[in-house]
Amino acid sequence: MIEYFFILVIGLIFGSFLNVLIYRIPLEISLLRPARSSCPKCQSPIKWYENIPIISYIFLNQKCSNCSNPISAMYPFIELLTGILTVLLYIKYMFNLELIVIVLLFYNLIVLSIIDLRFKSVPDYLLILAILLALIIGDLKNALIFMGIFSLLELILTFYIQKIKSRITNNKRLESQSSLGNGDIPIAGVIGGLLGFQLGVSAIFL
């Protein structure tokens, strides 16, 4: 149990770092400077004891200590998700080179998914890294099949979802817009290459 708790703590710490990546990468802010994160609203530097995964979020009452700006629940969610995922992967693979590659891949997918969800676009280098990591431990054939299937799925979803939005808002321009992010198809390919066809289908629809 102590071993798993230690792995959980490591996962939570990495989850906090993933939050930094998710915030800074789309805004093209250096990952090195400033070294300390700050409040997006008042730019007040976040003290070390205000940056403890999950715990600080609870004790700060979900708001900035300086300006009382609400802190998004997405931060502790990503930390907890990363922590739990790290423990589960450790239990399955134990400590070896394969575990390191798989953990890096899943961390990358978390960053890709959240950025894609928020901005409908993802950096090419993160996609390339995810695909390379998936190919190391996955199946190229499954990846290509999944990219094709998900591309078709995007067309169908875009047609129906945007048509409904167009009717509700009486805005015909919405019919030509995509309802999914630009990174969804490559991400689907990575999932397919990693999990295989049957598990990949389940993961996509979940």
Locate each region found by the language model.
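Transmembrane helix-loop junctions in multipass membrane proteins, especially transporters and channels
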Residues: 24-32, 91-95, 117, 158-167
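Membrane-proximal soluble regions of multi-pass membrane proteins
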Residues: 18-74
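Short, Lys/Arg-enriched, disordered terminal segments
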Residues: 1-6, 167-169
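Intramembrane alpha-helical segments
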Residues: 62, 68-140
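N-terminal signal-anchor transmembrane alpha helix
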Residues: 3-27
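Alpha-helical transmembrane segments of multipass membrane proteins
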Residues: 14-19, 82, 86, 146-154
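Functional transmembrane core segments of multi-pass inner-membrane proteins
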Residues: 107-206
